[in-house]
Amino acid sequence: GFGPYMPGYETIPYNDLDALEESFQDKNVCAFMVEPIQGEAGVVVPDEGYLSGIRTLCDKYNVLFIADEVQTGIGRTGKMLATDYEDARPDILILGKALSGGVLPVSAVLADDEIMMCIRPGEHGSTFGGNPLACVVAKSALEVVKEENLVENAFLRGHQFRDRLKNLGEESELVKKVRGKGL
């Protein structure tokens, strides 16, 4: 574990909509941030309906939905964003890693004008954000993702890969569980 944690943040169990709704009873909660697929925790894919449930609860309680798609975004899951699997559009989207195709470090924080216009200069930043060269590389990487159908390829190859791993699991005790989406 890392620490100390920043004051004002609360950690709730992943994939638990009841715990999320309970935390929203606190009128001081302004946002909920989640990785759509828990990467560092061991590729933990949430139950179907979790992401759309987050969207519904955030709307109900007027809480911002922040999706940290640094590891899952830009087609890695077989959709452009992992939240696309459930049409759970976040209010704020965090991207990185694949954004530049691995060429240069770059990240981005995206939101509608309604949110972004509330942030004054100096109040917001992103690690590796704003580098003009990295921005050109990111734009080119996104064009390649689109032109070469890399999202669809990740979807198809991901299914193929997991199917083969499941077959290996039937033949060997080394593979206990196969999880994931896309590649």
Predicted features and spans:
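Conserved N-terminal phosphate-binding loop of PLP-dependent enzymes in the Aspartate aminotransferase
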Residues: 1-183
